[in-house]
Amino acid sequence: MKMDRRQFLATTVAGAGATLLGCGGAGGRQAAAAPANPYELGPLGKTGIKVSRIGIGTGMRGGGRESNQTRMGREVFEGLLKGAYDRGVRVFDMADMYGTHEYVARALKDKPRDQFVLTTKMWVHRGGGIPEPERPDANIVVDRFRKELQTDYVDLVLLHCMMSAKWPEEQKRQMDILEDLKAKKIIRAHGVSIHSLGALEAAAASPWVDSAHVRINAYGEKMDGPIEKVAPVVERLHKAGKGVVGMKLIGEGAFRDSDEKRNASVRYVLGLGTVDTMVVGFEKIGEVDDFAARVTSALQAKA
């Protein structure tokens, strides 16, 4: 299914847009009501990349180039990806360690390349993550990524799972190579996925970071510290013009069986005003619809 921009912006989750938002202007004038759009496009910081409010992650319980999504099998997983796109999801988040590049490439092969965003991550740590022991430089890795993704460019490439507060010093070589790839338009932006408070602080202070994947929800579940410590650093990222991609909105599945916690987490993250897109590791298309409905409800409550 191909949608032009106008069609895309008009799309809302089925049944979730029945309540309309009223918009009052100066002097009490009423603008035409418009449905809340859980998939609305917005900027990823100052990268120039436009992202949908909801993105799909592909690495639930991921490692060794497989994940819950790949374990579904090709037909089911690619059907999930296509269904997400048809609903309005435009951010597809991957990583080398998830083994999901080829699945995403096949699912989106008939879609206009400028209508979706590919984000992926390279594993630089010794041990774990990916099967082989070698850790080639970023130019070699990204070239393989482009072949696997069947694309000339990748929108966002991240250094995966940064835990050390000294990662900007330790990863200087790969950072410089990624900077060169951006200058050559092989990638559009670079950044980090964060897995410690110290690494998050370093990302907020680093001019190199275009965008960061951060773990954020209302309860501190699977996060890098209590929300009262994490949220201010995320705000610094945002104010510095860096893209902010929210992860672990559902606590890596911890809130799956709690309507109250899922709703509270969505409301909390949207209320921060600092997260550009929310990436969730959906495993069923019904989960996409459910999350979109919760986002719609939260947006309407904010209006």
Question: Where in the sequence are the language-model features?
Answer:
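Beta/alpha (TIM)-barrel catalytic core signal, keyed to glycine-rich beta->alpha loops juxtaposed to Asp/Glu
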Residues: 6, 161-303
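N-terminal binding-site loop/beta-alpha segment at the start of enzyme catalytic domains
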Residues: 2-116, 268, 272, 276
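Short, acidic/polar
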Residues: 69-83, 134-148, 195-202, 261-268
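Conserved, mostly hydrophobic/aromatic
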Residues: 44, 56, 92, 118, ...
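Acidic (Asp/Glu)-rich catalytic clusters
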Residues: 46-48, 105-113, 146-150, 204-207, ...
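Active-site mouth loops of central-metabolism enzymes
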Residues: 60-74, 125-136, 256-258
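Active-site groove signature of glycoside hydrolases
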Residues: 149-165
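Alpha-helical scaffolding within the catalytic cores
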Residues: 36-42, 101-102, 140-145, 196-200, ...
